[in-house]
Amino acid sequence: MGKTDLSYTLADIAFRIGAELRGDGSVEVKGLATLQKAQAGQISFLANKNYLKHLKDTCASAVIIPSSFADQCSTNVLVMENSYFGYALCSQLFSPQWWSMSGISPSAAISESAKLGAGVTIGANVVIEEDAEIGEGAVIGPGCYIGAGSIIGAKTQLRPNVTVYHGVNIGARALIHSGAVIGSDGFGFAPNKGDWAKIAQLGGVVIGDDVEIGANTTIDRGALDDTVIETGAKLDNQIQIAHNVKVGAYTVIAACVGVSGSSSIGKHCMIGGGVGIAGHLEITDQVQITGMTLVTHNIKEPGVYSSGTAVEPNASWRKNVARFRQLDQLARRVRVLEQGGRRKSDAD
């Protein structure tokens, strides 16, 4: 990240992120950068020893670093054992406010029965329907839609063009990025003589405190019960959460994941990009699922789970696909050989 108009002394940064300062606390810092590209007036960090080779040549005014590497740094250091966490906290200090608007835009269409908390910011062309509630200090970006009876918690931020359908409850300090749709109909249809009858989706969506939802992610409302995203969960861009899904507290889900209806993901899970989770499954707490995995059964034990075939040269892949098609035949041949071996052993 380059320089901003924000500025802090190293002593101030150390206090704010809980680091031990070794060096000149009066040095002024105006931005963040990598070890390779940092200049005077910027702060950097070392969280991966593979980048240790860049430490001695960095021009950064300070480095957030674990104690085991602090002596190898020739500039000021902010010592934190979890230096990546320190970097995260420091990045928040230099993140500029994304909105320039203040108060309530005259172009916003707000129902007379809606309730607005103190200090809310509502951008241009926002629509807030009847009986919706916007919590204290919340920020609703331009072009957002808040459906009837929905609740937006205190200090929650909706970036421009977020759609929140009716009957959605979003907790405090959430951050929802542009294009996200919360509370759209779940995919429910009943077959009848070659036709499909729509199942009205009568549930809602409940989102806890401190949740982040990425751009163009969709979270469907429940069919009868609510779809639930618990406190502290983080969802990347372009994720599909189907009706009646539950995502446990502090679980993180990377981009392009699809979670089918009525599945439950536990707490503190990590779901890699492109994962597909079939419906009506239960995944316990502390599970990691690597990218592009297809989950078709319950996961009852914590751990790391994977499926799929890694990339290889096309010619090799084609040969292996041909062999894969012969697996059933090969299995039968092995079975015959094993049975023949047993008969011969019995005869001996």
Swiss-Prot record:
InterPro entries: Hexapep, Hexapep_transf_CS, LpxD, Trimer_LpxA-like_sf, UDP_GlcNAc_AcTrfase_non-rep. Keywords: Acyltransferase, Lipid A biosynthesis, Lipid biosynthesis, Lipid metabolism, Repeat, Transferase. Pathway: Bacterial outer membrane biogenesis; LPS lipid A biosynthesis. GO terms for molecular function: N-acyltransferase activity. The keyword Lipid metabolism applies. It comes from the Bacteria. GO terms for cellular component: membrane. The active site is at 243 (proton acceptor). GO terms for biological process: lipid A biosynthetic process. Its EC number is 2.3.1.191. It catalyses: a UDP-3-O-[(3R)-3-hydroxyacyl]-alpha-D-glucosamine + a (3R)-hydroxyacyl-[ACP] = a UDP-2-N,3-O-bis[(3R)-3-hydroxyacyl]-alpha-D-glucosamine + holo-[ACP] + H(+). SUPFAM superfamilies: Trimeric LpxA-like enzymes. Homotrimer. Belongs to the transferase hexapeptide repeat family. LpxD subfamily. NCBIfam families: lipid_A_lpxD, PRK00892.1. Catalyzes the N-acylation of UDP-3-O-acylglucosamine using 3-hydroxyacyl-ACP as the acyl donor. Is involved in the biosynthesis of lipid A, a phosphorylated glycolipid that anchors the lipopolysaccharide to the outer membrane of the cell. This is UDP-3-O-acylglucosamine N-acyltransferase.
